UniProtKB/Swiss-Prot annotation:
Lineage: superkingdom: Bacteria
This protein's GO CC annotations: cytoplasm
Transmembrane domains' residue ranges: none
Similarity comment: Belongs to the GroES chaperonin family.
Species lineage: Bacteria, Pseudomonadati, Pseudomonadota, Betaproteobacteria, Burkholderiales
Biological function: Together with the chaperonin GroEL, plays an essential role in assisting protein folding. The GroEL-GroES system forms a nano-cage that allows encapsulation of the non-native substrate proteins and provides a physical environment optimized to promote and accelerate protein folding. GroES binds to the apical surface of the GroEL ring, thereby capping the opening of the GroEL channel.
Subunit field text: Heptamer of 7 subunits arranged in a ring. Interacts with the chaperonin GroEL.
SMART domains associated with the record: Cpn10
Matching Pfam families: Cpn10
Protein name stated in the entry: Co-chaperonin GroES
Cell compartment(s), UniProt: Cytoplasm
Main location: cytoplasm
């Protein structure tokens, strides 16, 4: 994938959601909510501040992140669906 996001934008691939509950019930794909976790695939150069300086992003490529249900814009690239969002749409980085 050859995408380079601009400024404070981030490219995120949604992580697959569990299709089975803890009690063993299988959740049909139509009823499953979209996952709110993903892996950062690419990041922009940073946020341009009012004084013209660039603040580097806190997230890095490979980070696992949490984001809101309606965060980002979904796009297809090379047959894969990814999200393009601003860093401020990311709520947390999942620590390993």
């Amino acid at each position: 994938m050859n995408l380079r996001p601009l400024h404070d934008r981030v490219i995120v691939k949604r992580l697959d959601q569990e299709t089975k509950t803890a009690s063993g019930l299988i959740i049909p794909e139509a009823a499953a909510e979209k996952p709110d976790q993903g892996e950062v695939l690419a990041i922009g150069n940073g946020k341009i501040l009012d004084d013209g300086k660039v603040r580097p992003l806190d997230v890095k490529v490979g980070d696992r992140v949490l984001f809101g249900k309606y965060a980002g814009q979904s796009v297809k690239v090379d047959g894969n669906e990814v999200l393009v969002m601003r860093e401020e749409d990311i709520m947390a980085i999942v620590q390993k």
